[in-house]
């Protein structure tokens, strides 16, 4: 399952994501991962969640992010949910075909490995393509 939370900067996406993380901690029985661009949410995310500061790595494209996620999962098969805050900013790109392909890859990975993905992206909902719309 892939879920996108979309909206412009300041629309409450990260706040909603934090609420969903807290709900997941209470309701899910596996491990939870949260990837953010910087370490600014260290005190907002429960300590049970594996918090990853993406600025410590060179996330220079979706292929790297796919490999990183695959590596996380191969090291810990108990991961049930991966949250990514502002995935476009982590990669450093706007919404494009590569982003759409990444979301589809996450969907297929999630089905195969029983992992949920919840991500935020900072774009106007009206600019979402059909391939993006199915995730929110």
What is each model feature region?
Residues 1-71, 128-130:
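Conserved P-loop
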Residues 3-5, 32, 79-84, 117:
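Generic beta-sheet signal
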Residues 28-29, 45-47, 76-78, 112-114:
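Short loop/turn elements that form and flank the Walker-type P-loop nucleotide-binding site
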């Amino acid at each position: 399952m892939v879920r996108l939370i979309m909206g412009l900067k300041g629309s409450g996406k990260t706040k909603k994501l934090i609420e969903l993380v807290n709900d997941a901690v209470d309701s899910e029985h596996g491990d939870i991962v949260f990837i953010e661009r910087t370490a600014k949410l260290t005190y907002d995310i429960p300590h049970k969640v594996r918090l990853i500061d993406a600025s410590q790595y060179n996330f220079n494209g979706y292929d790297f992010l796919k490999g990183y996620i695959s590596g996380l999962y191969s090291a810990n098969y108990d991961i049930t949910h991966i949250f990514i805050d502002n995935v476009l900013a982590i990669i450093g790109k706007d919404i494009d075909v590569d982003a759409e392909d990444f979301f589809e890859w996450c969907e297929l990975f999630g089905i195969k490995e029983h992992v949920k993905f919840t991500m935020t992206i900072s774009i106007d909902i009206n600019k979402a393509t059909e391939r993006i719309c199915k995730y929110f």
